[in-house]
């Protein structure tokens, strides 16, 4: 790819709540940019971007498909790498890793539903990765559609500085098009060409005053970011040119000070071309984003890499997928330098050089072979033997580790076994491949029962895994009841001396440590082990201290109550002693593991459970039943409000253990009139009666609490 093209490259994603019409919008983008000749509809199960069979059956997007397309705007041809992301909360890992490699995003909303719970989650994820975005209010043709109400909700709920750049012409059945407030023209779409043709006309007389009013509001907003514009705005707003407005809106969007707002009806083929024009106008190119910062694994120093093909190569693997034809496909974003087909590239995690046999740019799940993927671009490669999501790929002579992605721990598990013993190998092979693709899906063997336990982000997540085992790996499974992924914590600090001694003829083993073990400090927010070395005078030699730390890190994976992991732990190594012959690294590691077990048992161990944030939208007359049911489930109602449609919104925090089968129960209570959505919020300590019940089930004993 020629270097100057980077100005004309856009790496974008469409992010939203489930059912806001993301996939339909992506389909229209592919149709209007000429990549597909027939529009695939989600409700027919034919959408190009939803390529897994389960997605086509369920009408939701599970894996984020990456597609490269082109669009002409203002005399230039722009290259758009479009990533379609799922809106269901069970698939937040897909959203998280997409946002990590994007430069900009389109936040899509339903004109009726507005800002929904998953919209908030995704918005926070985009804030975390500093992704500039524009807003698109979809489904303007639906009954109850209200563009301005969604703009207000964006301000109130998300704290976004939402700024309409278009206003709708009509709404619901009469939605025909938009008024572009920059050009001050009406854009009307024609049904007979499926929206491919549209006309630019004068603003309808009944909308002129409203358009002038909204244009003035837009000018006032953008003038805040540009002193020269502010002057013109107060002197004579009519002298402000189109170029000046575009420049100021782009600057405000890139700084994340403003969110330009658009609207349309993707399903009815209206509004998508305007959206594409302004994706090119306002969202950043790879050159607008700061140089990527990474760590040199040799020196530990921070280094940055600019988005140029002349720099040393750095790329981040953000997704791994298994393709039936080419095998394992690794999707990556190249930040600097270039990756060439047939070349070798170094993986800083594995410390190995790997040959990239072939490179592709993707159109949904079809591969278009390319020879090179340069800085600022997204593509997929084949040939990697040992690769994981979040790995950094670079030149061997210039190693760098880019910040990887953080994924939440799975919250729900089920036991699985193949229906026939001969499928055992197929099952473990299938599970290993699926775990490789999805960092929020884990597989482990229960030490006591020997069962295989798979864990994920929710019931739908695990349903789809079971479904994929059946379709892709031809393994039928029996599955157990869902289990909650509890964790353990300690509540007190305990000081303890641990001595590990072993004499078995010849050289023995010896380690001696004095440690204080307790909850982490309040300002230690990253989780994991907070390890502090206070040993004076070499009583424990420096080379053994990492072994003590490693011992505690290993031990934290199994708590003393029921073998559930600890999220965080503070260990202060105060003193100890060693033997000049018998002490070695393994002795100190084993000594630390023993110290952990003995100290945690005395440090007030408790069980914690996942608490979910629940939102239920229900008719007024079912409110009492819904709240009564939540109370039975140990739920805490945190608030109630009215929606625009007259329904009531109930917000609550409820333990996941009480929520299995909730969707069916809610349907029964409200005769199918209520909907709910649930996201993980935090882990909280369980009461002693529940802890006893869990321990009885897991351990067959309750004397530990």
Curated annotation (Swiss-Prot):
Transmembrane segments: none annotated. GO terms for molecular function: GTP binding; GTPase activity; translation elongation factor activity. Residues 7-287 form the tr-type G domain. CDD domains: EF-G, EFG_III, EFG_mtEFG1_IV, EFG_mtEFG_C, EFG_mtEFG_II. Keywords: Cytoplasm, Elongation factor, GTP-binding, Nucleotide-binding, Protein biosynthesis. It is found in: Cytoplasm. Residues 302-312 have a biased composition (Basic and acidic residues). The keyword Aminoacyl-tRNA synthetase does not apply. Signal peptide: none annotated. One of its GO terms (cellular component) is cytoplasm. GO terms for biological process: ribosome disassembly. It comes from the Bacteria. Disulfide bonds: none annotated. Pfam families: EFG_C (PF00679), EFG_III (PF14492), EFG_IV (PF03764), GTP_EFTU (PF00009), GTP_EFTU_D2 (PF03144). GTP binds at residues 16-23, 84-88, 138-141. Residues 293-312 are annotated as: Disordered. InterPro entries: EFG_II, EFG_III, EFG_III/V, EFG_IV, EFG_V, EFG_V-like, EFTu-like_2, G_TR_CS. Catalyzes the GTP-dependent ribosomal translocation step during translation elongation. During this step, the ribosome changes from the pre-translocational (PRE) to the post-translocational (POST) state as the newly formed A-site-bound peptidyl-tRNA and P-site-bound deacylated tRNA move to the P and E sites, respectively. Catalyzes the coordinated movement of the two tRNA molecules, the mRNA and conformational changes in the ribosome. Belongs to the TRAFAC class translation factor GTPase superfamily. Classic translation factor GTPase family. EF-G/EF-2 subfamily. This is Elongation factor G. It comes from Phocaeicola vulgatus (strain ATCC 8482 / DSM 1447 / JCM 5826 / CCUG 4940 / NBRC 14291 / NCTC 11154) (Bacteroides vulgatus).
